[in-house]
Regions:
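Long, low-hydrophobicity, acidic/polar, solvent-exposed interaction domains
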Residues: 1-141
């Protein structure tokens, strides 16, 4: 149905309200990931995005100082939360497409990980508990 459902933290398999519906793009899943705050109030995606923009600006000013190998190494450190002002916690995103998810939606989900410089994400299968939660939420599978 071209929809995204997501939850934060440990799944609450008997609480259909835990699962939130959102949309694709800047005002949907991207905003949700940007606005996610850790227990100490850090918004890791926003902080890492800013650091990547700074890295890209430095590379644009001095392209010879940033051959691809150096750029990729610095980018990997940023994605791991290693910022100039210290290490921050990062997000781990688990992508669980349903059997009727389209290839385009899967590619779009992976694109969001790249756009937001999310360094840790996995693709997993829906398990019985996930299916139960989706059914409680009224999601058509």
């Amino acid at each position: 149905d071209n929809k995204i459902y997501c939850g934060e933290g440990e799944p609450q398999y008997n609480n259909p309200a835990w699962l939130k519906e959102t949309t694709w793009g800047n005002n949907g899943i991207r905003k949700l990931l940007r606005d996610h705050a850790t227990a100490n109030g850090t918004k890791p995606v926003t902080r890492i995005e800013l650091a990547v923009k700074e890295l890209n600006a430095e590379k644009a000013k001095n392209p010879k100082m940033y051959p691809d190998s150096i750029y990729q190494k610095k980018l990997s450190k940023l994605k791991a939360g290693e910022l100039k002002d210290g290490k921050i916690p990062t997000l781990t995103v688990i992508i669980k497409p349903s059997d009727n998810a389209s290839y385009k939606n899967m590619v779009d989900a992976l694109d969001e990980m790249q756009i937001l410089s999310i360094g840790t994400y996995v693709i997993d299968k829906l398990n019985a508990d996930d299916l139960h939660l989706l059914k409680l939420r009224g999601v058509k599978l």
